[in-house]
């Protein structure tokens, strides 16, 4: 029986939808050690993120990515927000002890990328 992996998704655009679909479909294709749980999603617009959550099956929403990153019930933070936000979110998620999936580009330049790793 796979163990739950609680996902916190930041961003609800094309890549947020793509990743959400992948989380829902992956167990149908692969024998996974972990089962993705759509625990929370986050965006600044409360109405839009609530509609996104209802459509994709997320359990809860946040409008501040910092709150999502600090939540104890989130195991992995999936960063699908605008490119210029990746660095700050990824560093905060790492400091909070989360697993991180960051959409490309990882950073805006090599200096930012080095700061992240």
Place the predicted regions along the sequence by residue:
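N-terminal Rossmann-like dinucleotide-binding module
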Residues: 1-56
């Amino acid at each position: 029986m796979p163990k739950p992996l609680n996902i916190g998704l930041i961003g609800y655009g094309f890549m947020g939808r793509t990743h959400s679909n992948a989380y829902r479909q992956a167990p149908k294709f692969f024998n996974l050690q972990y089962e993705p749980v759509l625990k929370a999603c986050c965006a600044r617009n409360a109405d839009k993120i609530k509609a996104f959550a209802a459509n994709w099956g997320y359990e809860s929403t946040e409008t501040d990515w910092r709150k999502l990153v600090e939540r104890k019930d989130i195991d992995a933070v999936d960063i699908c927000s605008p490119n210029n936000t990746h660095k700050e979110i990824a560093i905060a998620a790492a400091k909070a002890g989360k697993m991180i999936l960051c959409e490309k580009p990882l950073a805006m330049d090599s200096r930012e990328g080095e700061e992240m790793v």
